[in-house]
Amino acid sequence: MTIRAVVRGVGHYLPARVVENAEFEGKLDTTDEWIRSRTGIERRHFAAEGETTSQLAIKAAAAALADAGLSAADIDAIVVATSTPDFTFPSVATMVQAGLGNTNAFAFDVQAVCAGFVFALANANGMILSGQAKRVLVIGAETFSRIMDWADRGTCVLFGDGAGAVILEAAEGAGTAADRGILASDLHSDGRYRELLYVDGGVSTNGQSGHLRMQGNAVFKHAVQKLAETAHAALAKAGLTPEDVSWIVPHQANLRIITATAERMGVPMERVVVTVADHGNTSAASIPLALSTARARGQIKAGDLIVTEAIGGGLAWGSVVLRW
């Protein structure tokens, strides 16, 4: 008998405020056409004044619990991937725990920026395989609007706010690639590249955060190469190839990176989940948001083989292969 961490439920939450590209015209030297042609982004959601990362995460978690037909008390562990926590501490995960009314789980945050959800999934998988937890609530949640430099057209038009959640549950498998659940993961970091993507100040409880800084062209080159490599590596660990993939669910950084990575992997865009036009780059929230959205659209179905891949500041990058 082999234990697998299978997806029991998914959910997401997006703030009510929708910001179209046109809102940036007049404020910045940019246009809707410029943003669309370079990023594929048409709109994004921004949190309201006072709306926090933990609040978005709680709503996404509640949706995932409802989808799974579970109560908060059924969860043994909560892992939140975020780089925009409400406070330096306590963790967003413990705030989610309190918000859901759970008192029996252990809860902690994972910080790998845009790669955070992939790292969190891999951690949750390990906890289930080791027997530490039977059900793990894994959340990606961000309020990147708090750390934007609104004078920098190269970054502030890219990002959005939101949250997505996945509930993993221990289940018996046959130990083959036909099993449901997480089949393999592949994680990497290289701190030599910290200057390519970072925030020039820390989280603070008075709301005065630093601003995101990015060398976009350099990040693009690293992203396409490293994302394709890590996806291939995870598939190889599972004894699978790109031809076996039903869906790539990538980090929704921008359409150019998504398209170039799929091309490098030899996977047609018809088998790639794309939500970046409506959400922008929501960092650690983008993959669970895309999973939940794709399931709601009827794209992802039971038995589908899915590859998630992401890269973020650090640099940190990785992928997870799972069967729905």
From Swiss-Prot:
Coiled-coil zones: none
Sorted UniProt keywords: Acyltransferase, Cytoplasm, Fatty acid biosynthesis, Fatty acid metabolism, Lipid biosynthesis, Lipid metabolism, Multifunctional enzyme, Transferase
Matching InterPro entries: ACP_syn_III_C (IPR013747), ACP_syn_III_N (IPR013751), FabH (IPR004655), Thiolase-like (IPR016039)
MF term (GO), any: 3-oxoacyl-[acyl-carrier-protein] synthase activity
Annotated catalytic residues: C114, H251, N281
CDD domains registered for this protein in UniProt: KAS_III
EC nos: 2.3.1.180
GO terms for cellular component: cytoplasm
Compartment(s): Cytoplasm
Pathway entry: Lipid metabolism; fatty acid biosynthesis
Catalysed reactions, as listed in the record: malonyl-[ACP] + acetyl-CoA + H(+) = 3-oxobutanoyl-[ACP] + CO2 + CoA
Gene3D superfamilies with a match to the protein in the record: 3.40.47.10
GO biological process terms on file: fatty acid biosynthetic process; secondary metabolite biosynthetic process
Region (ACP-binding): 252-256
SUPFAM superfamilies registered for this protein in UniProt: Thiolase-like (SSF53901)
Assembly and binders: Homodimer.
Family: Belongs to the thiolase-like superfamily. FabH family.
Role: Catalyzes the condensation reaction of fatty acid synthesis by the addition to an acyl acceptor of two carbons from malonyl-ACP. Catalyzes the first condensation reaction which initiates fatty acid synthesis and may therefore play a role in governing the total rate of fatty acid production. Possesses both acetoacetyl-ACP synthase and acetyl transacylase activities. Its substrate specificity determines the biosynthesis of branched-chain and/or straight-chain of fatty acids.
Free-text domain note: The last Arg residue of the ACP-binding site is essential for the weak association between ACP/AcpP and FabH.
HAMAP family on file: FabH
Protein name from the UniProt record: Beta-ketoacyl-[acyl-carrier-protein] synthase III
Protein species of origin: Rhodobacter capsulatus
Lineage of the organism: Bacteria, Pseudomonadati, Pseudomonadota, Alphaproteobacteria, Rhodobacterales
Gene: fabH
